[in-house]
Every structure is written in structure tokens, then in C-alpha cells.
């Protein structure tokens, strides 16, 4: 016991250097000292719990379908509802974080999302499942306070790494739930419950954990380096901001006022365009991740078939000649298509899980790359890191679409996943610089862009799944490569990628 006490005391005793605004200049992963590292670990753990519960229904869907006699359409629509719910919520949560602080908002999301999760066992039909997952989608909004929290606690030199780590490790909950929920389900069955009762009891467990965490963080963590949100230090106003709100007007000439007004208007225009581009690009990385997670195992089953297996074509043509319904044709096609696959459902899911497991380090890798280039190239370095990761993602998606063997597909899939999640890390290493007074709003908008992208990609998948599933990944790759070029038009703190080349030319002139 004494050893444990000494260990905990050591974790709390580590001092962290801070800047003039009170933000941490150091990152000590194995410390839980308040306020910085306590906030870091709290935000990532809460986000992890939110993702675990958000997707907690998915592993139990086969049993739920069996009990409620649900169609594939019901299940597909419930999945769309789960993602769609977070789009508007992420936009709303951002301003709420600016107003009340990340701690209270994170607590509110966990407590609110735990209620429908705990009541999941009461649903009776497909409509009930759709409505249920719509409300459980509240938990998807936890991403915004998670990123907001670390942006408030860490300064510009390490905020990219901090944001990437909490985001990536939080996303791991989406993979962990496919291990956790089946284990709870089997444990309840082992205790004597039948499978229909077991899933209803199993969903209560993550709901209970979310509820406990939602209450606990109110008393064990801080909103900002100063503690409560009301004591936070606001970003320093520039002379421009001061002129706009009317202070020091007497010190300015009329010409200076007009210049400031035009400058502010130009700055706001660039802010809007930058936020829009980041929303689009987050849809090209996080949106791709969410969409890929929902279709990847099916793609592998469709793609890799036993050579010469034509059972599907024969039986489908026979069914069509007999005049059966479209629904029967589709079900027959799906069953035979799986029969011809080299993989079974378990092995396909195992391979597909690799895509999500890269969150353990890949998102942080993107943030670290952004921080490293920032030290040498300043803000243009962050923009270059962002564009390189997106371009790499696009190239790997195109290569993956052309793979015809399972080993090569696994290798390219893993590399592609690293680029996808690294791009997510570089995206949110840029967010704190867009408008420092509105980090929460911008984080919410960008996060909503990711979910919007996921819905768009899933809609395209529906159109291509029966024609050429590989084309879906090819289209994604082309879109991502094109979207990466938009980075050239991002302007943050009056800096673009082009400023790097201008500075190089200026240095050469000075040397001459």
C-alpha cells in the first residue's frame, strides 16, 4: 500500500512549465497532475467511453435483428441516424464549450447519452432502433469538448500532439466495443440468461460506466489552467480587436480606422473560407474513416472470391427467371456471394479491425509531424504536414482499390489507415490557430464536416456496391488528392503555405 501511495505521489508531483497565458509548454504522459495532464487523461478517457457506447449496439445487431425480425434496411437506416445525429450536435456543442467550458459539456453529453443506451432493451421494432440510435448519437458530440479541452490546456508548440493523442485514443473506443460488448454478452449468457435477455442487460453496462464518469469528472478535473471556466485568461486582444470594439479610438486617425475596418473584413472572409476548407478536408479523412469502418468487412467478402465460383450468377439468374421479388433476389445474392468468398465473416472483420487499431498511434503521428515542422517552419510547416498526409491518404486509397491478393490488401490497408488518421491529427493541429477566441465553435464545425463526409461516402457506396465496390475506394482516393490541394488556400494568422517560399526568397536576397 505504501508503494502505491509513493507511486501516486510521484505522478502528482511532476511540475509542468507554462507560458504567460498559463498553458502547458511540456507534455508528461505519465503524470496525472492537475490541471494539465489530469485534463488530458480525463478528456481522452471520456471520449473513449463515448465512442465505446456510441457503437455499443453494433456488435449486438445480429441478436437484435433475430429477436425483432429487423430488415437490413432498418439496420442500415439506424446506422445513418447514429452518424447524422452528431452533425448538428457538434455545431451546437462548440459554442456551448465557449460559454460553459469543456468539463460541464462533456459531463452533460455522457449523462444524456447514457439514458437511451440503458433503455435500448425496450425497443420493439425497426423504427424504435432508428430513434434509439439517433439519441445515442449524442455521444458522438463528445469529440468537440475533448479537442477543446486540450486546446485550452496546451500551448501552440505541443497542442498538435495533445489533440492528436486524445482524438486517436478516444477513437479506439470504436474498436474496443467490438471486444467489450460481445464479452459482456457472453458473460451474461453464461450466468443463465437467454440471448434475448443477455443483450438487453449487456447494453446497461456501458451506460452505467458513462453515467459514473459523467458525474466524477465534475469533481476531479479542471476546465482550464486557472481552474473553473469563469477564471480563464482570455486571449490577448490585438490593436485591431481593440479598435473594432471602440477602445483607443481616440488614438487613431480616420485613415487608420478605415484601414483596420478593411483589414478586419478581409480577415473574417479568410476565416470563413479556412473553416470551410477544414470542414471539407475533415470529411476527407475522418469521414473516410467512419464510412470505411461501416463497409470494409463487406468489401473484403465481395472482393476476394474463390476462383471459378459462379454459384451466385447461376442462382440469381434462376431466381429472376422464376419471377421472385427484388428483396428475395438481393438476399439470395448476398448469401451466395459470401459463400464464394475466400474469407468468412470472422476473418473479414478481423482484417477490417486493423483499420481502426491504427488509432493507437497514427493520429498522434500526424500531430507530432505537425509540431515538428512548426518548430522549423512555423505555421507553413503545419500546412505542409497537413497536405502531405492527405495526399498520402489519397494515393494509398487508390492503390488499395487495385489490390487483388489478401496479403497486399492488408499491407496497403494498414498504410492507408496510418495516413487517414494522421490527416485527422494534422487537421486539428490547425484548428486552434483559425480564431483563438472561438476554438469551440470551429472545432464543432470541423467535426460536423467529418460526419457529413461519412454520410456522403456511405451514399456513394450504396450506388456502387452491386456494380464495382473497388471503384468506391478509387473515387475516395481521387477526391482526397484533389481535396489536399485546397490546403494551398488556407490562410491562418495571415499566413499561407506560400509564405514559406516568400521567406526563402527574402533570405536569399539578404544573403546577396
Each model region followed by its residue ranges:
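Helix-breaking motifs and short loop linkers at transmembrane-helix boundaries and internal kinks
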Residues: 69, 101, 122-127, 139, ...
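Residue-level signature of mid-helix packing/kink "hotspots" within the transmembrane helices
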Residues: 55, 82-91, 141, 175, ...
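Cytosolic juxtamembrane N-terminal segment immediately preceding the first transmembrane helix
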Residues: 1-52, 267
Amino acid at each position: 500500500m505504501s508503494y502505491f501511495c509513493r507511486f501516486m505521489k510521484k505522478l502528482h508531483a511532476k511540475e509542468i512549465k507554462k507560458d504567460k497565458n498559463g498553458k502547458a509548454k511540456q507534455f508528461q504522459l505519465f503524470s496525472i497532475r492537475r490541471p494539465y495532464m489530469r485534463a488530458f487523461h480525463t478528456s481522452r478517457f471520456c471520449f473513449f467511453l463515448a465512442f465505446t457506447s456510441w457503437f455499443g449496439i453494433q456488435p449486438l445487431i445480429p441478436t437484435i435483428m433475430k429477436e425483432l425480425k429487423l430488415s437490413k434496411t432498418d439496420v442500415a437506416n439506424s446506422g445513418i441516424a447514429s452518424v447524422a445525429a452528431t452533425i448538428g450536435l457538434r455545431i451546437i456543442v462548440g459554442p456551448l464549450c465557449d460559454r460553459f467550458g469543456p468539463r460541464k459539456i462533456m459531463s452533460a453529453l455522457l449523462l444524456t447519452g447514457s439514458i437511451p443506451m440503458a433503455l435500448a432493451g425496450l425497443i420493439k421494432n425497426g423504427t424504435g432502433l432508428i430513434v434509439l440510435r439517433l439519441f445515442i448519437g449524442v455521444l458522438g458530440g463528445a469529440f468537440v469538448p475533448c479537442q477543446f479541452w486540450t486546446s485550452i490546456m496546451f500551448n501552440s508548440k505541443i497542442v498538435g500532439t495533445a489533440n492528436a493523442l486524445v482524438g486517436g485514443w478516444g477513437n479506439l473506443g470504436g474498436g474496443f466495443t467490438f471486444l467489450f460488448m460481445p464479452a459482456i454478452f457472453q458473460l451474461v449468457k453464461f450466468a443463465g440468461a437467454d440471448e434475448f435477455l443477455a443483450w438487453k442487460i449487456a447494453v446497461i453496462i456501458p451506460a452505467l460506466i458513462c453515467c459514473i464518469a459523467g458525474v466524477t469528472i465534475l469533481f476531479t478535473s479542471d476546465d482550464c489552467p486557472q481552474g473553473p471556466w469563469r477564471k480563464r485568461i482570455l486571449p490577448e486582444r490585438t490593436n485591431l480587436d481593440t479598435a473594432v470594439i471602440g477602445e483607443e479610438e481616440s488614438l487613431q486617425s480616420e485613415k487608420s480606422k478605415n484601414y483596420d475596418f478593411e483589414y478586419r473584413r478581409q480577415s473574417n472572409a479568410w476565416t470563413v473560407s479556412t473553416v470551410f476548407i477544414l470542414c471539407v478536408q475533415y470529411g476527407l479523412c475522418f469521414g473516410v474513416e467512419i464510412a470505411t469502418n461501416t463497409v470494409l468487412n463487406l468489401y473484403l467478402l465481395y472482393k476476394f472470391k474463390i476462383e471459378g465460383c459462379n454459384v451466385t450468377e447461376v442462382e440469381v439468374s434462376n431466381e429472376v427467371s422464376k419471377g421472385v421479388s427484388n428483396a428475395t433476389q438481393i438476399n439470395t445474392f448476398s448469401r451466395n456471394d459470401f459463400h464464394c468468398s475466400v474469407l468468412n465473416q470472422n476473418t473479414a472483420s478481423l482484417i477490417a479491425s486493423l483499420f481502426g487499431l491504427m488509432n493507437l498511434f497514427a493520429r498522434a503521428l500526424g500531430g507530432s509531424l505537425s509540431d515538428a515542422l512548426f518548430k522549423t517552419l512555423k505555421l507553413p510547416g503545419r500546412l505542409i504536414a497537413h497536405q502531405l498526409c492527405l495526399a498520402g491518404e489519397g494515393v494509398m486509397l487508390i492503390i488499395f482499390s487495385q489490390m487483388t491478393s489478401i496479403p497486399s490488401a492488408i499491407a496497403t490497408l494498414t498504410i492507408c489507415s496510418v495516413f487517414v488518421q494522421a490527416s485527422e491529427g494534422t487537421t486539428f493541429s490547425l484548428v486552434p490557430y483559425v480564431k483563438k477566441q472561438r476554438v469551440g465553435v470551429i472545432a464543432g464545425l470541423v467535426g460536423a464536416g467529418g460526419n457529413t463526409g461519412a454520410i456522403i461516402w456511405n451514399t456513394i457506396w450504396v450506388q456502387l456496391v452491386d456494380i464495382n465496390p473497388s471503384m468506391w475506394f478509387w473515387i475516395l482516393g481521387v477526391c482526397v488528392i484533389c481535396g489536399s490541394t485546397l490546403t494551398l488556400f488556407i490562410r491562418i494568422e495571415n499566413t499561407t503555405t506560400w509564405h514559406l517560399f516568400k521567406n526563402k526568397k527574402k533570405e536569399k536576397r539578404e544573403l546577396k
